[in-house]
């Protein structure tokens, strides 16, 4: 497993070693030992989620507050997405900064988004199957959202002019970073 550091030290890209031949391919998609060594702490995942989206669907920027904060290990198993993590920890030197990565069925990369970050993605291909592990259960009372196009954050979403953007009503009503309930 190749661990790729991003501009925000806590957010990591996991790139598996893929072994292929005429029959297909094999790779180890998750190893608790490798993962915990890379993130520098013991992490326990309690829930796996799976979503399907069409091109232009933008989901996010979502997070859960304490005591239900979630870390997520995300990957795209069909198609391609642009995946984003935004640091929303007020005490962090990277507060308000974002990192993005293209995750696809082809590159098989995964992105680790720790607790204290908002997460979102945009579907870049006609069909996307997106799966992720979460460190805490879904808790609607702790769920919050930040608007996807907040100018203070300035996410450079790719291909915005290439397709019709599709967002949920909840995502359209999300707060700006300045007005959101955040981590300390």
Q: What do these predicted regions represent?
A:
Residues 1-106, 125-127, 132-184:
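Non-catalytic, conserved peripheral segments adjacent to functional cores
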């Amino acid at each position: 497993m190749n661990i790729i550091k991003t501009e925000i030290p806590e957010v990591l890209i996991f790139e598996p070693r893929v072994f292929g031949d005429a029959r297909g391919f094999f790779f180890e998609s998750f190893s608790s030992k490798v993962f915990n060594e890379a993130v520098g702490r013991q992490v326990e995942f309690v829930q796996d989620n799976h979503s399907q989206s069409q091109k232009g669907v933008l989901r996010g920027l979502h997070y859960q507050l304490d005591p239900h904060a979630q870390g997520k290990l995300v990957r795209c198993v069909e198609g391609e997405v642009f995946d984003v993590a935004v640091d929303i920890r007020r005490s962090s030197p990277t507060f308000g900064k974002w990192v993005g990565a293209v995750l696809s069925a082809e590159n098989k990369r995964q992105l680790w988004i720790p607790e204290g970050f908002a997460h979102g993605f945009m579907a870049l291909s006609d069909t996307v199957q997106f799966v992720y592990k979460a460190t805490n259960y879904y808790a609607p009372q702790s769920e919050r959202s930040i608007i996807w196009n907040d100018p203070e954050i300035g996410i450079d979403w790719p291909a915005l002019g290439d397709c019709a953007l599709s967002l949920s009503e909840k995502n359209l009503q999300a707060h700006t970073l300045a007005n959101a309930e955040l981590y300390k």
